[in-house]
């Protein structure tokens, strides 16, 4: 790859041309956080906009420009998860929320341990792309953002590893013993991630054997649960069913994967309280179809039991497509005889002048509020629509 093809920008040039409003970073973080909250995962979410200094440093190191290669992490979002098995679940949520271009993961070998993280490159939603200065796209900067997913155990050491080893290889030259020692720490963290999930799975199985249904659900699914107590009639049904059937309802709940439950929570058109009752109700609606449970939950109105309405709740869902209905229609006649033209104006010309006059009044009245109003009218096309991305 020839040096002539490399593109380098100065910090001052990038600072002058690349303008990213805070709303871009904030909205991406909000969209992701809302989806994770909706399904009850334990997580922390952070975001950042790349500084001009950081971009200049990266352009100096990488071969941007060659084969149209562009910087893809102008905006970055980091998701830290508490359970290792939630990484794949979170990846699926991202893929169902954004236009994902591709994923990459840490290279791992038998000789070396590194912080395990999953990096995704996603296309910016159009409404957020339009907020960024247009000069940005004239440079070798892609209209994408980066999502990084990793566990909390590795998050604790990732920044140290990134700065002290990835960017500081000279520290470890001729000191292989210290490097192996550092690797052993990272190996311990990886073992902790796996062991934590195994611990709760084993605990959940023991709770199932003991008939402690609420605790079994909490340990097995490991989601943020509300304070709702298991309905007595549901507990009684699970007890009776456990005594009579080999493939009883409680066992079927325990054998249901966390991914299946998360999918059901995300597919609801409205956010539901997450507790032991709604979990069983969701699994029954989608997997078990037990008429006895259906009757109990219908009587209890389970999905509204304990609901706390919030003004921000609508942020969790995509807006449904609007249906076109004629609710008002008026026929207007414009008298063009008073137009001072050398020749008689056509109907189209009369209409255009009338439209310009009306729009001129609107701009004069509201132009101060809406800075992006077009300067003139244009022909309406039925295939033009606005797309709002939640």
Feature roles, as predicted:
Residues 95-102, 168:
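A common structural junction motif
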Residues 89-90, 129-131, 155-158:
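Short helix/loop capping segments that flank catalytic or ligand/cofactor-binding pockets
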Residues 368-383:
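Active-site metal-binding core of divalent-cation-utilizing nuclease and nuclease-like domains
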Residues 1-74, 81, 85, 269-354, ...:
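Charge-rich, low-complexity segments
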Residues 4-10, 14, 20, 141-286, ...:
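An acidic, glycine-/histidine-flanked metal-binding catalytic module
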